[in-house]
Structures are given as C-alpha cells and as structure tokens.
Amino acid sequence: MWTILLTILIAGLLYRYVKRHYTHWQRLGVDEEPAKIPFGVMDTVMKQERSLGMALADIYARHEGKIVGIYMLNKRSILIRDAQLARQIMTSDFASFHDRGVYVDEDKDPLSANLFNLRGASWRNLRQKLTPSFSSGKIKGMFGTIDDVGDKLVQHLEGALDQSDEVEIKDVMTTYAVDIIGSVIFGLEIDSFRNPKNEFREISSSTSRDESLLLKIHNMSMFICPPIAKLMNRLGYESRILTSLRDMMKRTIEFREEHNVVRKDMLQLLIRLRNTGKIGEDDDQVWDMETAQEQLKSMSIEKIAAQAFLFYVAGSESTAAASAFTLYELSMYPELLKEAQEEVDAVLMKHNLKPKDRFTYEAVQDLKFLDICIMETIRKYPGLPFLNRECTEDYPVPGTNHIIAKGTPILISLFGMQRDPVYFPNPNGYDPHRFDSNNMNYDQAAYMPFGEGPRHCIALRMGKVNSKVAVAKILANFDLVQSPRKEVEFRFDAAPVLVTKEPLKLRLTKRK
C-alpha cells in the first residue's frame, strides 16, 4: 500500500517538476513556443522531418514579438525575432554574448578547438592571429589557384554537355568548392572533376554519406547539448573524417618543411603561423618558408587541422550553395540573367580577357552586378540558416521588462528573418536590385548572412570571390536555358545547412 502511494507521490512530483520546467517562459510572461516533452521544439528534428534551421524558421513564422521562449530538448533558450535586437546582441552588446555556447574541449579534444567553437580569450587570441590570412592582399595572392579550379569547372561542363544538356548544378558546384578547399586550404594538387576517387574527395564525401546514428547524435549535440558531445569524446568517440584530414595535413606540412616547398595558399600561411606565431603583412615575404624547432612551434598540428576543417565545412557548403542557387535563380529570371551575362562580357573586354583566359582578381572585383546577385542569393538561401550565441552575463532586453539570464542559449533564424516581409519586400522573390546603393528598400539591420560583429565569418571575402569566379566562368562560357519559376523545398539534414529535397537541375548550352 505504502509503496503504491509513494510511487504515486513521486510520479506526481516528477510531473509537476517537468510541467513547471517546460512552462518557464510562460510564467515569466515571455511569448513561448509550446514544448513537445521531452524534445521541446525539437520534435520535428528528432523525427528527421525538418532540419534545425528550418524548425527554427517555422517557429519564427508562428510568432510576432521581439523574443520567443523555446526549449531545445530540455534547455531553456531564446529565439530572437527582432532584427535590431539581433544586431545589437552581436555588435554593441557583444560583451554580454561573446561565446557561441557550442561544444569545445581544448585539452582532451584539440580537433574541436576551431575558431567557431572557441570561447573567451582563446577565441580572441586565435581570431587576431588568423585575421590577416583573409586580407584582400592574401586572397589576391591565392587567386591563381582559385582560377585554376574555375577553369577545370568549365572543362568539366563542356564534357558533360556532350552527354546531356542538363546538369545537377549543386553537385557540380560542390565538387568545385571542395577542390578549392583541398587546393587552397589543404595545399593539395587535386582535380576531382577528372579523378573523383582521389583521397581528399573520398574523405570529404564521407561527411555526407555517413548516416550513422552516433554521428547524427554527436553533430546535433555539439549545438544543442554540448555536455553529451563532450561525454562521447571522453568515452572514445572520434570523427574518422577529422582524423583522416589531420593525418593528410600532417604529411603535407612535413613534406613542405623537409623539402622547402612553398605554395601561395592558406596552408602556407598556417605553417607560418605555426612556426612564427604570426602571419605577417601583404608582401611576397609572407609566403616564405620559416621553420622552427618542435618545442618552439606556437600551434599543434591538431589545432592547425581544426581550423582547416572549419574552413572546409564552412567554405565548401557556402561556396557551393551560393553559386548554385545564384545560377538557379538567374535561370528563372531572363532579364536578370541577361544583365549578369552582359556585365561579365563587358568586364572581360575591359580587362582584355577572353572567356577561356585566366581571369584576374581585378576583373572579378569589377563584377558589381554579380556582387548584388550573390548578396540576394545568400539573403534568400543563407549558408548557415541560423546564428547562435550564449548569454555570458545577465542581459535586460531593451524595450521590455525581461532579463535574459547568464548561460541562456540565443538563436537567430536567418532563414526566417531574411524572408520576413517586414524587413524585405517580396521576400520569396529574387531581386538583386534591392541592394543597389540608390535603392536599398530593405531593413539593413536584418541582413547578416555572414553573422555580424566581432564573431562574423572571418572568410566572407574569400567566400564571395570563390562564388563569383564560378558564376562568372559559367556565364562567360555557357548560356542558361530559361526554367519555370519554382520554390525550392528543403529536407532534413543533421548538419546545420540547407539541403534541397530535389536535385537543382539546370540546362546549359555552349556559347557561340
């Protein structure tokens, strides 16, 4: 009898505790997204119906206030819906939100210690060291390598069109982007268009092929529940992809140092940072090989590999998506396609270049309309559909009576905000001219596809150049066949990116 009563009492107390936990925001008077216990707002993600980015966009669309209280599993979090507040959090109030709150374990898992994950002083010191790597002078120095991959892209498409006039443009752009990363970041001589079975491509392809449950749990817990990711690593979980790329990078670094091999790429700059503690100015000497005794090196191979893997994950997906979606949208808007193609032709003529010539950094910088096309693409299809921060000290929300407590995860739905008609007229259309300097008919606070403030994307300049080269090379050498207008739908993916449900197919013809 007493056992039954005790069980009922414990069950009642547990129910009351759980109910109280999942109505926390409601009791504070904060607009709240109802929780599906025990998943919170993650039920569609856990059922693999929606990606995390699209699930957050769904919540964004269902509410109207500045902030929405949500539950990521059992973690009390805040979704920011107000563009001005979101920008303020990442810029002027950065001191209260200087970390992302994702998994990192510098001591036991140095491969997790990348610029995206790091916290506090560790992040600040590394950011200062890496920032010179992405100056316009450094990118100009690496441009020849980027352009070489662009030429291989054109050659591949010319061969593919001999078989069919239809191509899966996202797949093609992914190969292009991965080869740039392999060449510029990892210092490899590769051509995945001709040799898709090369070691780097095989390793990188396994990131999308690996459907193991452990990988999905680890990937999602890095964002949603870092202690689970930390526990998995302490128990021996290790990313085969990361360790394979680390070993590949180690061999390349050792070969370069042993044989005094110098190449104008990001790896050369990372080697210099490892050996000297700094990267240096935009001059020819920055590419020189400088070595140091192992005990004097400022960064381990693991930490170098962690940064390279971050650049791979962020750079390959964002470049592939931006270039593929730009071409896809232009194919549906013939007047914009004509304008873009005519600009490419005019700029090539201005710089005395033919479509098959090596492009120059200066010519690509002159493609101003293509700039705003890519700006509109990454508004509509942000490479990372949400931004995340962690509240690092209690923060009074401006214009409200609410206080965000220290330790609370903060989420900003870029997909939701950048498709909100409050901020962008006709948000589901494709209108590059909204970014014309004499137009600007949108709320500039709401546009932040690369993040904002001190933790904005460090490689945004290189990402834009990579995408522009791909699109410009294709427009210079091929005509896009007009496609019927159709909205893209997205499917579940454990990684925090946009993955289309259906292939992005385009029809091309060779230009006469």
UniProtKB/Swiss-Prot annotation:
The keyword Metal-binding applies. GO terms for cellular component: endoplasmic reticulum membrane. It is an enzyme of class 1 (oxidoreductase). Keywords: Endoplasmic reticulum, Heme, Iron, Membrane, Metal-binding, Microsome, Monooxygenase, Oxidoreductase. It is a peripheral membrane protein. One of its GO terms (biological process) is response to camptothecin. Its cofactor is heme. Heme binds at C457. The keyword Heme applies. Its main location: endoplasmic reticulum. Gene3D superfamilies: Cytochrome P450. One of its GO terms (molecular function) is monooxygenase activity. Its EC number is 1.14.-.-. It is found in: Endoplasmic reticulum membrane; Microsome membrane. May be involved in the metabolism of insect hormones and in the breakdown of synthetic insecticides. Belongs to the cytochrome P450 family. This is Probable cytochrome P450 6d2.
